[in-house]
């Protein structure tokens, strides 16, 4: 592992942030492509009910995956902080303790997704014609949830060490296997949504095997023993960071599931169109998401090294990068959303419904660059309780009520429902600006015990 590249406490902020962010972005692009391939192949070689099933089922899988990612952020932040503090000997206990905690999380998710797949599909208000396929998709993905959780745990460890290239390799393997699996099972054997789910789980399993092999062969800045694989003093530390982030992400993703349910009431074509739009949205959010993940590691390492001003400069650098890309994505989504939707479906009604949603959502491409950069900054500063609080305000007081209100109007449209996302994000930016002012003033006179 290149120590200079992994040292964020010196050198050009812009160059090092971009160098670290590009592999993170690459991994996110492949992950988005990974999910989009399922929808694309089912949309072209499966049925409309299968397309709706993958659309709804992937929303459930996204909820689980994003919550796990945020939970794992506690591990990333803690490892980066120990590197900044020059305490690599603590990292082995972090990794060992995290392995035990995430195994338990996997077991719980396995039970819920496998044995309650059909109730979940009904709760999501999946169209009647797609309920069975939706339940099948959720059940199969639940059966392989151990691999999905393991992949995100391993990725969080490498990113905490300042290595964003290895997770890129992990997801590249998964993406290649998933494409082959989708073509074989959906296009070849006509297994529809179930085939897409099997391909997803198989790809994650092979990716985890590859990641473990790479971890064993790499030269790491820490050692780990059998005694580290237990509940230890590091567990409460990464749990205190990760739990609040996971709860916030859970409620955020729950709001998107509720949004999916609101849309499903508008019919099968609206449901399928929304599913297509969500895949495009996933791509639109890639740069802000990469910034948020990169910012947390970058800022945490600098805070651990006592370089608070450098951490602050990183925030504004990230916002600038995000806004530049966000304006381009906004223009593309707003003006060519129908063309983008056409990549995932040949059904004219589905394409139009997708584009209708994207028109309302488009502004989110710009404002999220600001919000996610600020969230990454606060995560790196261990201000995860605030990140959770502002997320709850956005979700419970703005996004959900507004989306529901729009969905029950006599002239309800996907465009109006899509507006709920950028409106709630703008509220989040205002809240975070206020907290940034408070936090900056507080850092003028920090208490000695504030650093973890």
Regions found by a protein language model. Name each.
Residues 72, 141-159, 167-175, 196-209, ...:
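Short runs within selected transmembrane alpha-helices of multi-pass transporters and secretion channels
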Residues 29, 33-52, 121-128, 184-191, ...:
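Helix-terminus/linker motif at the lipid-water interface of multi-pass membrane proteins
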Residues 1-21, 79-146, 188-243, 299-364, ...:
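Short alpha-helical transmembrane segments in multi-pass integral membrane proteins
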Residues 24, 28, 40, 77, ...:
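Transmembrane alpha-helix boundary and packing residues in multipass membrane permease domains
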Residues 19-38, 140, 174, 203-207, ...:
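Transmembrane helical elements of multi-pass membrane transporters/channels
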Residues 26, 30, 34, 64, ...:
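Residue-level hotspots within pore-lining transmembrane alpha-helices
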Residues 51-111, 148-167, 273-337, 368-390:
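Small-residue-rich hydrophobic transmembrane alpha-helices
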